[in-house]
Amino acid sequence: MLRMDTVHRDKDQVVILKKTNYLPYLVNLFIPKLFYPEKIVVARLYLNVNKHDKHAAENFKGTETPCFDVPPSLFSDKVPMDKIVFLPTVMLPMGFEAGGVFGPGVLTRRSYPIDLKAAGHKGQTPPLFIGLLMDIQAPTKVESLLKEVGESQPAQDILMNWVRASNNLINGEQPKEQELRDEFSLSMVFNLPTPPSPPSPYPYGRIPLQFNIYTPDLSNVLLLMSHQRDLTVAILSTINNPHVPSVAFAAMGDEEECPKFELPLSAFPTFEGVNRPIFLPKRFMPKGFEAGCVLKPGALSDLWFMDHIGRFGPTQPQHNGSITPPLFVGKICREEPTVDMIRKIQLEIEKKASEDATLPAVKPKIDISITKGFMVMETAAEDPKPPKGAYSVQSYEEAFDDGCVVKVAKRVATEATDTRGRDEIRTSCDQSQEKDEGSAEADKKHLSCFHVDSDIDNIAMAMARMGVADMSLPAEGEAMPGIDGDRALIQLSHVMEDRNQIRTHTDQLMQDHIFRMNSNRMLALRQPFTCIGCGAQENK
């Protein structure tokens, strides 16, 4: 696409359409920028996409079409200006006040724009579109916003533009091309935000696009209309409203009834085969409708959209812009009260904005304890600083609440505990006295806890500084059913004492495994392998 110098055109400058050898429908032609400082746009067309419309040629032949003076400076060689075919207004892309096309093979290779011609192109030159943009004076704020945001317009902004357009319709600002019809009213689609679905653990391939059937789920869609009729039509989007296979199974199955109605013959043609309308179950229809059907992409012709919807129809993003978009036809339920869709959309936007603004902290209803500690250790009173990798606690209760399951103390404290455990009969006075002594003894000593994922070398180093120390499990046997506490302590002691040997043995096992893998790989490749011990190469 090329942008050239600006030209001036009178509003009443028209020409009679006589030559209709190539007359494409270019409403879906995408121009990648909203506002241009220049007004003339030159774009290459493709015959397989921008096809000749025979019905439009027969319908518009002999009518007046807007035209403009094409400057000869656009081309490097002489061009037959009399062979340009100016398009009717309803066939122009959005944002153009006039435009014409040179058919395939009309322009010579020398006169065709070099930037738009593919390298190594053979055969006749492709068709060319030359359009004159409307004189749009964007506000200063809009121009600065477009420079900051970029060339593409977000989908949400387009959606809000539709909402503003619906407000203009309600206020009585009806465009001339949108006539009030008795058969149906035109609606605009608003998709409510849906929560994201959790990721599936089973990956699956992408469903290929298909146009033999189209059944979207419209239960979360709002339809905005300027005036209410028994029937309403709305242009759908294959991107925002994709095909859902489960809806197709429900529409073709016998599980539930799909309410049906007759489409008026004065407004809709007779559908046959795959183009026939598909009526949706009520749970997949928008709210406020008693029946509804969907016409798949390409079921209606371009002329139908031009005659019944016109250029006012809100554009929707589509996977394929070369065919007509899908259409929803719904029958409004008169029994249900009317819903103020505009107000509902405003409340939805305000709710989302308030949720995004502040997210207050939510306190859990119950206290969920997270395991922090693994081993509680008594350190000497003269060394109040906890060992490396540990943190201090005030009492054994705090350590046990953090999840400590192993207690490490000096041999003297352990023997005293064992002596008290061997006493079979103890009076209540003795128990209270022992409790007071234990609390007083705990006050004189410092308690430190190690995490579950603490470095085992730091734990072993702290135990070595204590001298002769014993490990015990504070929990009783009833709290750990099926666990042999003595055996667990013996295994933990072996891990602490023989950790270097365990690491060396594990490293040797990994080296042996690597050697076997390399040997098997070399044997499979019929190549000599190198011995790890001596470095010599051997053949087997």
Curated annotation (Swiss-Prot):
Ranges of Basic and acidic residues composition bias in the record: 417-443
UniProt-annotated stretches for the region Disordered: 416-443
UniProt KW keywords: Repeat
Superkingdom of the source species: Eukaryota
Protein name per UniProt: DM7 family protein GD24576
Keyword NADP: no
SMART domains, sorted: DM7 (SM00688)
Similarity comment: family membership: Belongs to the DM7 family.
Presence of the UniProt keyword Ribonucleoprotein in the record: no
